Regions:
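N-terminal hydrophobic/helix-forming segments and targeting peptides
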Residues: 1-391
Length: 391
């Protein structure tokens, strides 16, 4: 099949993104957001199923129902918090869900979810010394860290008994309000763009394929995980026939990185190690041949769904496509142009064949038959005598 760019419904992308951001979904409390994604897929005529652990899977069938497939992986869970302790002053001590700095939590408005499903308590994260008129310069001199902040509850409460009367207890989930904003210049500012912007891009790509009446060359599975931020990610739920996995997640826009907010990113490696040589270069070729603005990058303090998949034993090539995000896990910002480039690349990838459609039909094969695209293909005559590099 010859690949062709598809029409991207940017209004749909924007709407889905804003609606996703409006649904609180810290890791461990993701039922609502998964229901939303399932409803969006159902509206496209794509059925979905849910695993015991909450991951959602769906499928765009290719022309064949056997052999090797591919998978796109995103996650709907976000960083957040949990009530660790009720404090004597009527405030709450927090434990983080996921890895993020208290520096970006100070001043954040939050929702506290009690076991009473009809009651959500609001509050705000504040430093322990929050009053400038009381502490003066000590406000700036206090440390930065979760031990230096607390949640002020928006109810008339001054002690532990008052908190318990509100139904608040240790283990209650605390969601940080995203405060999304789309600017006239196309920037999207919000907490939790990681990875809800990725989910919106993937849903938009699937919509473009369905609207165009295109049958993917290879059966394409979608796996929406709910524990990426706490390290489990795609450790389960992948179809055993999957030969290629592409994770879609936030790319790092910061000094020393090549990612941009207005472009898609191809990660060549992250904190776990390099991604698959052949799959990454195939994605780069697709982007280059079809005018997708794609930059390559390598991340240091980074881990994604595919790391969990590989560690769980997935027999698949893995890659990571991203949308550039400034201030990741903080006051995040990306751009609609970058999301559009990412969505288009996903549309093209869904139309393409596997890197090695015949060889990857099985999890393993004969070394001599491997059609390597690398610069050092296997020598069919066998290993040379003596140390490598010495004639």
């Amino acid at each position: 099949m010859s690949l062709k760019p598809l029409e991207i419904d940017l209004d749909y992308l924007r709407q889905v993104l804003v609606e996703l951001l409006d649904i609180p979904s810290p890791s461990g409390r993701t039922d609502h957001v998964q229901q939303y994604v399932g409803e969006r897929l159902s509206a496209l005529g794509i059925p979905s199923t849910l695993t015991r652990r909450g991951a959602l899977s769906a499928c765009l069938p290719g022309p064949r129902q056997t052999g090797a497939d591919r998978a796109i992986v995103v996650h709907t869970d976000t960083i957040g918090g949990m009530v660790k302790r009720l404090k004597e002053n009527g405030r709450l001590e927090l434990k983080t869900i996921g890895t993020h700095s208290a520096r970006f939590a100070e001043g954040a408005h939050v929702r506290i979810f009690t076991d009473d499903l009809d009651r959500v308590v609001t509050g705000q994260v504040l430093p322990l010394k929050a009053s400038g008129h009381r502490y003066n310069d000590d406000v700036d001199l206090q440390g930065v860290g979760w031990q230096h902040v607390e949640v002020r509850v928006d109810e008339p409460v001054e002690d532990i008994a008052g908190l318990r009367a509100l139904g608040i207890d240790a283990g209650d989930f605390v969601a940080f309000l995203p405060n999304p904003m789309v600017t006239p210049s196309g920037y999207v500012k919000s907490r939790h763009l990681d990875d809800k912007a990725g989910v919106a891009a993937v849903l938009t790509a699937f919509k473009a394929v369905v609207d165009a009446g295109i049958t993917p060359t290879v059966t394409a599975h979608l796996l929406v995980t709910v524990t990426e931020e706490i390290g489990h990610g795609a450790s389960h739920g992948l179809d055993p026939d999957v030969a290629e996995i592409v994770s879609v997640d936030a790319a790092v826009v910061a000094p020393g990185q090549q990612s941009r907010e207005d472009a898609a990113t191809l990660a060549m490696g992250d904190g776990v190690g390099p991604f698959d040589y052949h799959l990454t270069r195939n994605l780069a070729t697709i982007a280059r041949e079809h005018g997708v603005d794609l930059v390559r990058d390598v991340f240091d303090y980074y881990r994604s769904d595919v790391a969990a998949a590989v560690e769980a034993g997935a027999h698949a090539r893995v890659a990571l496509l991203g949308f550039g995000v400034d201030a990741t896990h903080g006051h995040e910002r990306t751009h609609l142009d970058g999301l559009a480039h990412l969505t288009q690349l996903l549309c093209l990838y869904l139309q393409s064949d596997l890197v090695f459609p015949e060889w990857d039909a099985e999890p393993e094969g004969d070394l001599a038959d491997f059609p390597s695209l690398a610069v050092q293909p296997a020598n069919e005559d066998g290993p040379r005598e003596g140390p490598i590099g010495i004639d």
